[in-house]
A protein has these predicted regions:
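Basic, Lys/Arg-rich alpha-helical nucleic-acid-recognition elements, primarily the DNA-binding modules
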Residues: 1-16
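Short coil/turn segments at secondary-structure boundaries
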Residues: 13-20, 193
Length: 204
């Protein structure tokens, strides 16, 4: 369930970010944006591109494990992405990829085979779905972003941990779109080179 709150001329929708209701809500937003470009800054690696083994590791610490439902939701999102209904741009801090490759920070304790399979899958999807899927890597020492998704010109959603803040006021959506454009301009690895960069990290 979401709650609409008036903020000036805008409407702010608060939706719970708990699995798996959040996954269902995200899929609804993706379908709503059919035909429009979707832009996304994930909290970690992009959920839509996570492998089952990576999700299994992430869910290991969750009290009520709902991995089957979560993986099914991710598969639905990946199928939507593969359909080519919308172009999809993702901006990820380069240190996120490097940490996954090295098994440091958030990925400390993840088996090497799990981490490398995950990165290999992302690289493969980049090759197979380019240019409708474009991933850019930015340097978080130079630029920063909270997790956010812009669903075309009419909806932008910011992730704040326990809930999603969804903005539908045009100027707010434009502002977040401009923010994403800034991340792309400042990218240290362009979408054309991301798969090569990722493979270089796991082939060392």
């Amino acid at each position: 369930m979401s709650l609409l709150l008036p903020i000036g001329t805008a409407a702010l929708s608060l939706s719970p970010a708990e699995r798996t209701s959040a996954d269902e809500q995200l899929l609804e937003w993706h379908h709503e944006a059919a035909g429009y470009k979707v832009r996304h800054v994930p909290a970690t690696l992009p959920d839509v591109l996570k492998t089952k083994r990576m999700l299994d590791w992430e869910y290991a610490s969750v009290r009520e494990r709902r991995l089957p439902e979560a993986f099914s939701a991710m598969q639905d999102q990946l199928q939507w992405l593969s359909s080519g209904v919308s172009d999809y741009e993702i901006a990820v801090p380069v240190h996120e990829i490097e940490s996954c490759a090295a098994g440091t920070a958030y990925y400390k304790g993840v088996e090497k085979s799990v981490r490398y399979e995950q990165l290999g899958f992302i690289a493969d999807q980049c090759d197979q779905m380019f240019p409708r899927l474009r991933i850019f890597l930015f340097d978080a020492h130079r630029v920063f972003s909270s997790p956010v998704t812009i669903f075309g010109p009419n909806l932008a959603v910011v992730y704040v941990g326990q809930c999603y803040l969804a903005f539908r006021e045009v100027e707010r959506v434009k502002s977040l779109s401009s923010h994403f454009d800034w991340l792309v301009r400042e990218a240290v690895v362009d979408a054309r080179n991301v798969s090569t960069h990722i493979r270089s990290l796991i082939e060392r």
